[in-house]
């Protein structure tokens, strides 16, 4: 086995102590590690704002759901405060990040649940940050509501989406546990481009997934060519 143990992200500060237990040494002999420092945003052109963590999906190639736990979202007011702080520090662009960004379901000041499109609208209306960029969004979480918000603010919201398609073959996608077909993904791309004609699309693709035949690989390659991604992150499958 290549992996003996997976430690969840919130427990990373305990890694040194656990390693000491395995090695049989005193943890006091290991230099202490702080809980982290706030990164000085002055002079930076872009700053990540984490709005979500965790994942409820069970894709067969992924261990993130175990490492990061169930989906949870940062409250709307907290997100807005972070964006304003970045703006006051002179940062011209914030990037909204999360393990499963499209699953954002944070609470508002009135205790109502807010989805990603509503959060983006709130950032536009209640902050003056010059530019906002959305990081990776699962294909099945792309909604026309989100696209219309992006289209309403072309000068402030980057016309960019990263779509972790993983494969362009429906049979491979099913083995991966992905909840969409290759055809459904292309329908999503058409919807995106109908609302955002100038959009730039990037993607993640896994090659060599267990059971993938030469024919399935060619199907995946053909889809990528039809879509015409601006950039691709290609990963060879590994255990």
Where are the model-predicted features located?
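Conserved SAM/AdoMet-binding glycine-rich loop
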Residues: 1, 88-214
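Proteins enriched for Cys/Gly/acidic motifs involved in redox and nucleic-acid/cofactor modification
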Residues: 1-105, 115, 161, 183-194, ...
